[in-house]
Each structure stands twice: as structure tokens, then as C-alpha cells.
Design a protein with these regions (language model features):
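N-terminal, polar/Ser/Thr-rich
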Residues: 18-53, 136-144, 450-451
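Zn2+-dependent metallopeptidase catalytic core
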Residues: 56-58, 110, 114, 163-165, ...
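A surface-exposed beta-strand-loop module
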Residues: 74-136, 505-510
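Beta-strand-rich binding/interaction modules
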Residues: 78-84, 185, 449-450, 470-521
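Extended, low-hydrophobicity, Ser/Thr/Pro/Gly-biased non-transmembrane segments
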Residues: 114-222
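Juxtacatalytic substrate-recognition/specificity segment
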Residues: 136, 174, 203, 223-322, ...
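Acidic/His/Gly-enriched intrinsically disordered linker/tail segments
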Residues: 340-399, 403, 407, 426-427
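Amphipathic alpha-helical substructures
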Residues: 390-470
Length: 529
């Protein structure tokens, strides 16, 4: 029985692995001392045995001398050798971590670590939500490979510092070798393609900072369909679609759909973030993921109509993450709503642009109805990807932006939202938490928005509005659980009035029963006395 168990674990290491892996959380002090500057990932990918083999090189800076270096790598992959600054080092690989002790001490400053490794990586159980590798085939029987690892972290296939607070500031190189006839779609620019003895090597390079979970590649029998795109700032960038050969006829229309999305996203969030490289999408066997400059797309061209034109919700949402996740990145998974909620708000903004304000309002009303409100959006600090993840970080996060728009007004809200997406202090090498967003919008508003942020992001409470009829035609209205006055639309017999209401009751005159916040700008509870 014991021997059978060992064999089972060796042959099928992926059964429970992905569900047990988490990304982020409390940052290990030894890893906090490491500033990752650059990754080089060189792998041979063999679909016939579902294996990877190669090495990782990490350039890093130590803030102070260290007794050891610590990297993350799943146990199902085997470390073969490790070198630090060209010298072979001893190591220990346990609990999904690699520990590299120094003979005496690693000096502060620059270090180069090379880790040779390989094996059969974890299989994605339910990609992209429970991630890992997918070894699929297209309808013609060709290998079709994808990686998704947002929840688990990139440690599912390469040694890394698995925490959202640190990205390789100087970018990354991916050198991926696959059987000849297949193509590799990766991040950044394709610098070199070479062929040798039945294998093809694709060298992808990005000079931008990039999240670990976006540092992935896709493999398939792809055809590259491309065009030039002129950004809102007048810059030319290549728009590329790595489409399965069997779906190549769909590619041009799909790029039309993508281009419409890009125009709207640039309008609200500023120029496409990666103009020095490309706009990229790759067809994948899973639904999709926001992999930087090579978004994963697997919605099978299931378009709906928006403004009378083809629209793909999945394509638009994942592409919106180029701004919200890839350019503006949460420092701690606890604040994941910044990436998912604001990106989801971008899903509503394209409805506004293509179908009008009324359609946008209806969408946000439906979003309000869909909010579960079982857990706060922000549940604490230094929590991992699994602890923070639930549906409301999307919908309720988006609805909170809708509320902010109403409270601030369009003249303040939209420029401030664009500033969050474009100001260097919030973007690229810099990461953000909720306090940064609150401070930015409060400064723009001229008053503290802390009570509003606290109520809707840190609790599951709804805005409580007290309504009391004090006379035949008079009503007293007050806000019970918010320590700041806010505008509220009130419908009376003479029409709709926008009135600023706080904890002190306001008297409203109306011959008919009043309606409070009829268009639903707040998640609220009305209490009638």
C-alpha cells in the first residue's frame, strides 16, 4: 500500500497540488531583502511527455547581507543545480521553497542566481481559476499548451519570488524551445527565432516590469495575424493575434473587436501602457487571463452586440487588465479589488460609450443586485490570493467606482480615475493599496472620503437611510451609518432633486410619497419609521 502511494504521487503529482498553492500573503523577511531586477527563463517544452527542462536566471539586489537566498518553486519540479555569481551552491528544496545558504554571507548589492531544474509541472485542474499547465490538442490534433497561475503564482513552473509587491523592474527574457511546427506566443517582443534538429526556439523579451503570473507563454499551431494600431497619443504599436490556424478566418474581425475596446479604454484610462512592445492576444484552451502584452483568449468568439457592433466581454475585460493589474498593480493581494473592481468598471464604461448612459445605469443596477455582500472587499492586510478572492471584488468593486462617480461628479471623477492609471507614482514600478486610491480621490474632492471607502470596502454594511413622514406632505431623511454628508437623489411631486444629506435630518416637502436614490447609485438599506 505504501509503495502504491509513492508511485501514485510520482506519476500524478498534480491531483491536489494546485488547490494547495497560494500566492502572496505575509512576505518572508528573507525575501523582502531581495529586490528582483530581471528574470531569464529558458525551457525546452516536450508535449509528448508533458515535461519542461531548463533553467532560471535571476538578477537581484540584496538590501543588506543575507545568510541565505529564498525562492519559490513547487515540489513537483526537481532542482538539479544552483549557481550564485557563477559558483555552484548547495541548496534545500522543501515546502515549495528553495533555500540557498551562503558559506558565510551573501553581500549586499547585486547577485546573479542560476537554477537548473525540470520535470512534469502541475496540471491545471480548472484553468484559469485553479491553474497550472494545460496540455491540450486543437481540433486537428496539434499540441495546444497554456499556463495560468494567478492564484498559485509562477512557482508552478519557474523559481521566483512569489509576491505581488516585487516585479522584475528591468523585465524578463523567455527562451522557449518546442517541437518544430509549433509556435510560442509570449510577452514583449520576439527577438529571435531559430531552428535546430526538429526543434524551434523562440526568444521573447520584455523590458517592462511584469507580474510573475503574467510571465507565461502559450504554445500551439498558431498563425500570426497583425496590424498597426495608432494610440490615443499618436504612437504606432503592433496589434498581434496568435490564432489557431483552424480559426484564422476569424482573426481580422476579432482584431476589429479588440480595437474598439482599446479605443474606449484609452479614452478613460490613458494611452495603451506597452507601446514600445505590442498589443497581443493568444488563443488558449482556457477562458482567458490578463497576461501582459499577450492576453489569453478562450471565449470562442461568442460575440454579443453593443451599439450594433460585435462585442466580446471576455476579450474586453482581460484587455482592460493591461491598465488595471499590469500597469496599476496591487502591492498586496488584500487590495485585489483595485485590479478586478476597476477593470470591471471598465466593462461598464464601454456599455456607456457604445450603448449610452441609460444602458450603463441599467448595467450598474444589475451589478448592485448581483452583489453578495458576504465578505468585505478588503479583509485585512498581507493576505494571500485565496483568502482575498471572491466575486464581490469584481462587482462590488466596480459598483463602488460607480458610487464615487456620483459623489464626486464627472468633472472630478473621470480625470482622477485617469490620473490613477497614468501618474508614475501609481504605475509600472510602483504598486498601490486602497489607502493610495482613497487619498488620491479625497484630494481631488477636497474632503476626506475615508468614511465612504470604509463603509463599502472594509465592511459588508449597506448605506442606511432613515425616512420618517412628519406631516402629510413632509418627510425627514437622514443617513445613519456614514460620518459624512453625501448627495442623494430624491423624487418628489415636483421632480428629482439632488440633496446633500448627512446624519442631521433634512426635511423634504412632497405631495406624493418620495423615492430615494431611484437610479441606484448606492448599495443601501431604506429604513421607514
Amino acid at each position: 500500500m505504501r509503495r502504491f502511494l509513492i508511485i501514485t504521487l510520482v506519476l500524478f503529482p498534480f491531483f491536489s497540488l494546485a488547490q494547495n498553492l497560494r500566492s502572496g500573503g505575509k512576505l518572508d523577511p528573507e525575501q523582502a531583502n531581495m529586490d528582483i531586477r530581471h528574470y531569464t527563463i529558458a525551457l525546452t517544452v516536450d508535449p509528448s511527455v508533458q515535461s519542461i527542462d531548463g533553467y532560471l536566471e535571476a538578477d537581484l539586489i540584496l538590501a543588506k547581507p543575507a545568510a541565505r537566498l529564498v525562492f519559490d518553486l513547487t515540489q513537483v519540479l526537481r532542482v538539479k543545480k544552483i549557481w550564485v555569481n557563477g559558483k555552484e551552491h548547495k541548496y534545500e528544496h522543501r515546502d515549495h521553497k528553495i533555500f540557498i545558504p551562503a558559506a558565510a554571507s551573501f553581500a549586499a548589492g547585486k547577485q546573479k542566481v542560476k537554477i537548473a531544474y525540470g520535470g512534469i509541472p502541475a496540471i491545471a485542474e480548472r484553468a484559469p481559476w485553479i491553474g497550472g499547465f494545460q496540455w491540450e490538442k486543437d481540433s486537428k490534433g496539434n499540441p495546444w499548451i497554456a499556463i495560468s497561475c494567478q492564484g498559485e503564482g509562477a512557482k508552478v513552473f519557474f523559481p521566483c519570488k512569489d509576491h505581488p509587491s516585487d516585479e522584475p523592474n528591468e523585465g524578463a527574457d523567455m527562451i522557449i524551445t518546442v517541437p518544430k511546427g509549433l509556435s510560442v506566443a509570449g510577452p514583449g517582443l520576439l527577438k529571435k527565432l531559430s531552428h535546430k534538429r526538429g526543434w524551434s526556439t523562440f526568444h521573447w523579451k520584455t523590458n517592462y516590469t511584469i507580474s510573475n503570473y503574467c510571465l507565461v507563454f502559450n504554445v500551439g499551431k498558431y498563425k500570426l495575424v497583425s496590424r498597426d494600431y495608432i494610440t490615443i497619443e499618436g504612437n504606432k504599436v503592433s496589434m498581434q493575434f496568435y490564432v489557431l490556424e483552424e480559426n484564422a478566418a476569424r482573426a481580422e474581425n476579432h482584431l476589429d473587436v479588440l480595437e474598439r475596446s482599446c479605443r474606449v479604454l484609452e479614452k478613460y484610462f490613458g494611452e495603451y501602457p506597452w507601446v514600445k512592445e505590442k498589443i497581443g492576444i493568444a488563443e488558449t484552451p482556457h477562458l482567458g487571463m490578463e497576461h501582459q502584452t499577450m492576453n489569453a483568449y478562450g471565449n470562442k468568439y461568442q460575440y454579443t452586440k453593443l451599439g450594433g457592433q460585435d462585442f466580446d466581454w471576455l476579450l474586453h475585460h482581460e484587455f482592460g487588465h493591461e491598465w488595471w493589474a499590469n500597469k496599476v498593480t496591487n502591492r498586496d493581494w488584500a487590495h485585489m479589488w483595485i485590479q478586478e473592481g476597476i477593470c470591471s468598471y471598465g466593462d461598464a464604461l464601454i456599455v456607456r460609450d457604445m450603448d449610452g448612459e441609460d444602458a450603463y445605469i441599467k448595467r450598474m443596477q444589475q451589478t448592485a443586485r448581483n452583489c453578495q455582500n458576504k465578505l468585505p472587499i478588503v479583509q485585512g492586510e498581507e493576505i494571500d490570493s485565496d483568502q482575498t478572492y471572491h466575486g464581490d471584488i469584481y462587482g462590488k468593486g466596480a459598483f463602488f467606482m460607480h458610487t464615487l462617480r456620483y459623489v464626486l461628479g464627472d468633472e472630478i471623477f473621470f480625470p482622477t480615475l485617469k490620473k490613477l492609471a497614468t501618474d508614475p507614482q501609481y504605475t509600472y514600478d510602483n504598486t498601490v493599496i486602497t489607502a493610495d486610491v482613497e487619498k488620491l480621490f479625497s484630494n481631488a474632492y477636497g474632503k476626506s472620503l475615508q468614511p465612504l471607502f470604509h463603509l463599502f470596502l472594509y465592511t459588508t454594511d449597506k448605506l442606511e437611510i432613515n425616512i420618517r413622514q412628519v406631516d402629510a406632505d413632509k418627510y425627514s431623511i437622514s443617513v445613519v451609518n456614514l460620518e459624512m454628508p453625501i448627495p442623494i437623489d430624491i423624487v418628489t411631486d415636483t421632480g428629482t432633486k439632488r440633496i446633500t444629506i448627512g446624519s442631521k435630518p433634512e426635511t423634504i416637502t412632497s405631495q406624493t410619497m418620495i423615492q430615494v436614490d431611484p437610479k441606484v447609485y448606492y448599495l443601501k438599506k431604506l429604513v421607514y419609521e
